[in-house]
Amino acid sequence: MAVLAQSAEICYTKPERKCFPVRCDCHIHMVLDGADWKRAIARHSGGVDEVWVRRVLETYQKLGFAYLRDGGDRWSVGAKARSLAGEYSITYRTPLSPLCAQGHYGGFIGEKYENLSQYAAMVTQKRADGADFIKIMISGLMDFDRFGVLTEDGLPPETIRELIHIAHEEGFAVMAHANGARTVEAAALAGVDSVEHGAYLDTDALHAMRENGTVWVPTLSTIGNLRGTGRFDEAAVAAILESAMENVAAFAAMGGLIAPGTDAGAWAVPHGSLSEYALLKQALGENAENVLSRGAAEIQRKF
């Protein structure tokens, strides 16, 4: 499987080629390669592979990307990319590593905390270490073989509220990996700055995001790029994508903020892919450019 969009195996469709002249990706993982997460992480086991990082940054530069927001990793790969990005005329933002609750999703890539006191200390340390923002993991993943199913429930609303409050008190914007209507609603009501993924939302969750100025980064590529791969149930993948695209359209119609982010590095999502723009354009129609430009500008303002 190709891991960079400039690879010969990647052929853009006409809708992808007609997308925006100045591109940004508001959710990537420099440490991952879109094919094999264990192999990708091992690439940096002896220290950050600068050759890899430069190759990825060059790919984004050639495709016209000017802004990248990393979801973080605990091996300092995103931090290295940030230090080099200026050479490629790219603004790069990173939380350094995401923070996840012990026993819950995210430990494969992030730092674990056992309680709120430990989390607060980690947030303070992020300030000292130079993080641009805080990334929290507050839910599980979609089960791509079963529509409507998540791999685990979200954290309790009161915990979500405290996580966001602590980070805001330190002066950080907060990016939240969040799926499920109640989890996203709780995060939005607590003032989270952006929601990543956001599967299976309902009207209450969408309104909460709209009323609280939450930017939604739906990462449709993590679903749409699974089609035809044979890895998951095709009917389930199609249903999950349809649900997400319907919610994207509904959120835009109510004036919500939506920004493009591929989750590049996730399986079947190569760095530099323009698939997110194509999927969002399909969901948003002729207003796509205006909607996404507005959302992307807000991400860049907040983060």
Predicted regions and their residues:
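Histidine/acidic-residue-rich catalytic or RNA/ligand-binding cores of hydrolases
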Residues: 34-39, 184-190, 223-234, 244, ...
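Short, positively charged and aromatic/hydrophobic N-terminal segments
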Residues: 9-13, 18
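Divalent metal-dependent hydrolysis catalytic cores, especially in the metallo-beta-lactamase
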Residues: 50-78, 89-99, 131-144, 173, ...
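Acidic/histidine-rich helix-loop elements
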Residues: 33-47, 102-113, 145-153, 227-236
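His/Asp/Glu-enriched, well-ordered alpha-helical/loop segment
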Residues: 241-303
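Histidine/acidic residue-rich metal-binding segments in metalloenzymes
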Residues: 117-137, 143-216, 237-258, 290
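Active-site environment of divalent metal-dependent phosphoester hydrolases
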Residues: 29-33, 74-78, 100-101, 140-144, ...
